[in-house]
Amino acid sequence: METQLQNDQLFLEWFGQNLLDCHFAQNVSVYLQDASMVHFKTFSEQIKIIRAPMGSGKTSALIEFLKTVSYIDSVLVISCRKTFAAELLNRFKKNDLNDFYLYSEIKERQINKNKLIIQVESLHRVTRNYHVLILDEIMSIIKQFYSKTMTKVKEVDAKLLTLIRNSTQIVAMDATVNRYVVDFFSLCMPHFKSALIINTFVSANFSNRSAYFCPTFIDGNLAFYGILKQKLGLGKNICLFCSTVTSADFMSELLKTDFPDKKILLLTSKQGKCHSVESWINYNIVIYTSIVTVGLSFDFLHFSAMFVYIHLVKGGPDMVSVFQSMGRVRKVTDNEIFIYLNPALIQVPLSVSPISIPQCYDWTLFEKSILQCSCMDFNKKCLSAQNYLSNSMIKQFFRIRHYIEKTTLLNLPDSLYLLCLLLDSNSIKVHIDGDVFPIAKEKFYAFTKMLVQGCHFFEKKKTDFVENTMTLKELFSNTNITVNGEFYELGNFQVHKDYIVNLNNFQNLFLKNDVDIFVIEEIMLTLKSEIRRFVFINALLQKYVATGIDVEKIKAFFKSRIKTFTLPENYICSKFYLLSDISGVHECGMLMDVAFLAESIRADLNLQSCTDTQTDISEDAILLCAARRSSEILRILQIVFTTHVQLFEKYNSYTLYLFNRLKGMQLNTWSLSIAKFSVSIIRMFFKCAFNMNLVKSKPRYIVGKPFRSLTKREIETLLDMWHVSRTNLKTYKELRKALTEASKKRQRKKIYKLLGHNISSYISETGCLFQHADAGMCLSSGCLLRS
């Protein structure tokens, strides 16, 4: 069924927009509530699944239901966030439900309370079953299973399934419940009756609102910042949601400069967790990120309008999280939401495809059929992810929704369309550049083009704090260095002895014996970047695969050494981080598949490694590699790197024209040859997996040696090989000129090379798997001091 979804139904299916049209198992009854707020305490079915928009009274209905539960029955409430769990406890106490405990206030490792509120990641601490099981914001709970903070996926998955199968009543609520949630409970509890309650009632606080998508940030009649300044100039208060910390900092600095007299509150992860929103009433401008989400609501009539700055970036909050966060302000006097999407960081290659198409009323059948191929291809690749998710039934069951949420972040039209659907489902009128959604396709094309052409990058914020610029090399080369307990000191500069030990361990495990200690330190410093950590792990595993080490041995080494290896954040070793701290990729199987694919590509291209910058790559080799590996490359690009690309055999000139119009990009030609497509997907793989750029290059006359570095003797040898007379050529300059002219006359095919950091040149081929016991002894701090 999953592979037969029509293109325009994909988002509707996975975000619950078409529940009334679905057919369910015989034990499922469907109820529609359209004239009142949510209520379900009188329903007799053991499983109650509630789909209701924001502001429809889901939590109030839950409280009324809990009041009907016998005091002797045990109740477990599972939340998606710690702050949400705490807010639920407060709401319960205000409504005389005083016998609930909050998991974070229980010191014991194992929890056995009769009535408990717990965040899903701590579910493994629960030691008993419960009569009544509540899953509030169930889609957000499911989303946590894909988070890197979920360190005990297998245990939590097993515990949740056990709790479901042993409960006598279940309540699951969310604004985007889909048919797969209903099917999930039907499969888990086939002997229970289920009530699917679809509530479409929306309070006036939301239904009276209008959302305006702004095409530009500064210039134009509907410029995002222009409207924001106008509101503040009239003495109104505004609330601004920013999807990233970078965009929040940018807007905060901009507003402080333009409105120095306004009271501004900035809430991001830098300021810590947000536990309350009551103080917002004291500010003219409140700027917040997704740290303010479900469980926190501002109910005072204080702000005139809501502004939303969405900085599309891989790893950022998905559109559902954005939608939930922007709904935290329940009342605005002008009933207006202004939204700006900045796609500056996702201007991806031409071959990247949209997953779905927006609800434009004038698509042709031919255009729909083109994007239907994209939709089916997306589903097919998502299904292949089952190989990586064997430790969790929940991750397996809901994987397509997860990949939709992550992949849309890298595609402007998908993000725009999905957010429009979510707003529309909450009865918020959506306007795109003056037109009411759904709009004509030409309007959609024009709008995305304006967003792409007008987007801007952020300048990196400079800090006034100046760090000590001394390096480890300068410290140990200075004769005035002293030892003070566990520290080496030079003035105010300190290095803990454990820092040197960590360098030693790092080399012993991963690097060649002859790598200089100060080069090792440079490598370790770069690993503070998450991208560099990912590249380093990929380079490690590819080297091990190339050496022919047994796969199970590599997996064991990954789990025991790579995954657990810690690196110091600073010289004094006050903080550490994990080498394997990588967003998105949490499965060893994924990394191993990347490594095997990388090794195959390396062999096809005759490279020394996947970060080899010295070897020329012929276009013929790239074409052959793409022909052999295209299906696996495209699968890995989607599943591991959440970048959706179709198979090149399905492309034609009109397909590419349509895709790129949707993305707001303009092609000089309407065609993309197989050669160009092949280069494109190989380039994308190297960039995603190894942060290396595949670029066109002039052929190197001697492999590994640039033209400017050739000696006179080497040039003479090349001229002789090419049968070029050098009778009258005496000087080095004359010889170089003759070589250049001769090269132009020779018929040469296109040549490419990799640009970037050749990290593989430092990596040991076997790690510590087959190293001698004395490896790395030269890295001791004593040796450093003696040198």
UniProtKB/Swiss-Prot annotation:
GO terms for molecular function: ATP binding; DNA replication origin binding. Keywords: ATP-binding, DNA replication, DNA-binding, Nucleotide-binding. InterPro entries: Helicase_ATP-bd, P-loop_NTPase, Replication_origin-bd. Gene3D superfamilies: P-loop containing nucleotide triphosphate hydrolases. Residues 39-195 form the Helicase ATP-binding domain. Belongs to the herpesviridae OriBP family. This is Replication origin-binding protein. It comes from Human herpesvirus 7 (strain JI). The lineage of its organism: Viruses, Duplodnaviria, Heunggongvirae, Peploviricota, Herviviricetes.
